[in-house]
Amino acid sequence: MATPLPPPSPRHLRLLRLLLSGLVLGAALRGAAAGHPDVAACPGSLDCALKRRARCPPGAHACGPCLQPFQEDQQGLCVPRMRRPPGGGRPQPRLEDEIDFLAQELARKESGHSTPPLPKDRQRLPEPATLGFSARGQGLELGLPSTPGTPTPTPHTSLGSPVSSDPVHMSPLEPRGGQGDGLALVLILAFCVAGAAALSVASLCWCRLQREIRLTQKADYATAKAPGSPAAPRISPGDQRLAQSAEMYHYQHQRQQMLCLERHKEPPKELDTASSDEENEDGDFTVYECPGLAPTGEMEVRNPLFDHAALSAPLPAPSSPPALP
């Protein structure tokens, strides 16, 4: 089963509309250009002036007749009229006349005046004459077609010096300022390297500064978070009494052990009335004293054998044991 094609997107529709409108506009312009073939085929006034002819008359496809200083030759080209020198030599065209003619044509084109056209039967399609300039801008040279039987005339400048008709050979210009270009390139490279080094040093300093700032922030946070100096623990009176009772118990226990050891070594003797209350006649039993009820407040269990010197609050010194009999 064939999958259905998705509908075209609005973007594709817009592109299609633009393409169709462009095709329609191109066809309309082409039709308008085809409706006026005479206007498109008629050369411009500057082209006619370069051909040394008058402007294109209305409805014609070619330029008008030759202008006043020129005459039409056998090939249908407008060539300057030859003037014979007083000595009777070859006729030579004058370059000043051609320059004056071109200046007059340009001025006439700007002013809008045109020469009256001649009938169409005398109009021919001439070959364009080449208008060139010398290599160094010394003068204006007009490339004139040469007839088979007429020698090529040599134009003269206003100063009377002949202008050679040979092709001008231009030597390639030698590059100047090569050392200056190399020096500029070296300076540009040096500035680029210096800028890159300065940028790298600045980035390194910035990274180190940011690292130091982060370390300082971490140290400040740890200092603020750390607890202060440990304060002395507060001991309730009940705990103090419990500690004293434990010490008394430890003392009595040590005393009973010492008495038992002495009785095994020596014969039994009668004890004082004070000691008879604490131990029986055989001495096989240990008397334990109850320290009393614990307080209703905080209660803490301590090891009697633990060194209480580690406590910050000094405990009362135990009473000295009575002398052994």
Curated annotation (Swiss-Prot):
User: Phosphoserine occurs at which residues?
Assistant: 229
**InterPro entries hit by this protein:** NPDC1
Q: Which residues form the signal peptide?
A: 1-34
Intracellular or extracellular location(s): Membrane
- Residue spans crossing the bilayer: 182-202
Query: Which keywords appear in this protein's UniProt record, sorted alphabetically?
Result: Membrane, Phosphoprotein, Signal, Transmembrane, Transmembrane helix
Q: Region annotation Disordered: residue ranges?
A: 138-175, 266-290
Q: What tissues contain this protein? A: Strongly expressed in adult brain; especially in hippocampus, frontal lobe and temporal lobe.
Record's bilayer topology term: Single-pass membrane protein
The superkingdom listed in its UniProt entry is Eukaryota
Acidic residues compositional bias, start-end: 275-284
List the record's Gene Ontology CC terms alphabetically.
plasma membrane
**Entries under Pfam families matching the protein:** NPDC1
The main location class comes to membrane
| Purpose of the protein | Suppresses oncogenic transformation in neural and non-neural cells and down-regulates neural cell proliferation. Might be involved in transcriptional regulation.
Q: Which protein family is named in the record?
A: Belongs to the NPDC1/cab-1 family.
Protein's name in the database: Neural proliferation differentiation and control protein 1
Q: Which organism is it from?
A: Homo sapiens (Human)
Q: What is the lineage of its organism?
A: Eukaryota, Metazoa, Chordata, Craniata, Vertebrata
Gene that this sequence comes from = NPDC1
